[in-house]
């Protein structure tokens, strides 16, 4: 059983600065870290490894120079995966969901897999698209929002996911892609033994060419900026008549 758990390196949000002049975001002092939502996917994959005999867990990520960081690689491997594959290329530096999913799908095909796990979204964009797109590109079953994994056999994964007023139990034929929610587990903090052992685990570094990736984006991100700050108007409308309601609605329209 080959399980791939995908993760993304994202800037530590507490170190992101805002340029007051134009609202642009300054990431220069923000260290990269594992996306919080992907920690749940890594933990879920390693828990499955304990249930399935001879299962192997491979952590997989695509990105730019952040993936060259040895500390970041050790952090991932200390959480339980048996090996790490990183696909590093300049074109993935600010990759959008479609590009990321295409690269992950190509890398997963090259590595081989029975099951792919990922978080519901990423800590930076939280587009909630990548997992679904990977399944679509690979033309295999894909389920998102999974809050519990019930069982795993050689050909079926049984899971639960919470809906608004009910709980679904789904049997998914393998191979498949599953995006897990934060309710599925509480990621463990790696022990010192696990951290030291992470340095001995294998790491494969691939490029876009190694996975046959040569996508052309139909659109590209031009700028990321914080919303402009506006002073509070402090408009007080007294009364509950039709005129006051109309005045309230008019002021509301101005700020929407």
UniProtKB/Swiss-Prot annotation:
This protein's UniProt keywords: Electron transport, Transport
GO terms, biological process: carnitine metabolic process
Annotated InterPro entries: ET-Flavoprotein_bsu_CS, ETF_a/b_N, ETF_b, ETF_beta_N, FixA, Rossmann-like_a/b/a_fold
Stated name of the protein: Protein FixA
Entry function: Required for anaerobic carnitine reduction. May bring reductant to CaiA.
GO MF term set: electron transfer activity
PANTHER family to which the protein is assigned, alphabetical: ELECTRON TRANSFER FLAVOPROTEIN BETA-SUBUNIT, PROTEIN FIXA
Pathway connected to this protein: Amine and polyamine metabolism; carnitine metabolism
Family recorded in the similarity comment: Belongs to the ETF beta-subunit/FixA family.
Classification of source organism: Bacteria, Pseudomonadati, Pseudomonadota, Gammaproteobacteria, Enterobacterales
SUPFAM superfamilies from the UniProt entry: Adenine nucleotide alpha hydrolases-like (SSF52402)
Quaternary data: Heterodimer of FixA and FixB.
């Amino acid at each position: 059983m080959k399980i791939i758990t995908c993760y993304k390196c994202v800037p530590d949000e507490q170190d992101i600065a805002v340029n007051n002049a134009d609202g642009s975001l300054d990431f220069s002092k923000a260290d990269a870290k594992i996306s919080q939502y992907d920690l749940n996917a890594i933990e879920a994959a390693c828990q499955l490894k304990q249930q399935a005999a001879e299962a192997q867990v491979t952590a997989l990520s695509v990105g730019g120079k952040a993936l060259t960081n040895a500390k970041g690689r050790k952090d991932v491997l200390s959480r339980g995966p048996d090996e790490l594959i990183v696909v590093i290329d300049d074109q993935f530096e600010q990759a959008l969901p479609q590009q990321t999913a295409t690269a992950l799908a190509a890398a997963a095909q090259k590595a081989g897999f029975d099951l792919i796990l990922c978080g519901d979204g990423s800590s930076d964009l939280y587009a909630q698209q990548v997992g679904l797109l990977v399944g679509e590109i690979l033309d295999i079953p894909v389920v998102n929002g999974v809050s519990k994994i019930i069982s795993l056999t050689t050909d079926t994964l049984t899971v639960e996911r919470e809906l608004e007023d009910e709980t679904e139990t789904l049997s998914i034929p393998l191979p498949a892609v599953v995006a897990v929610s934060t309710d599925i587990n509480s990621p463990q903090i790696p022990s010192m033994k696990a951290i030291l052992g992470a340095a001995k685990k294998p790491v494969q570094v691939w490029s876009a060419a190694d996975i046959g990736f040569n996508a052309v984006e139909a659109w590209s991100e031009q700028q990321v900026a914080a919303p402009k700050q506006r002073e509070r108007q402090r408009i007080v409308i007294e009364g509950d008549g039709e005129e006051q309601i109309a005045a309230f609605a008019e002021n509301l329209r101005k700020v929407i």
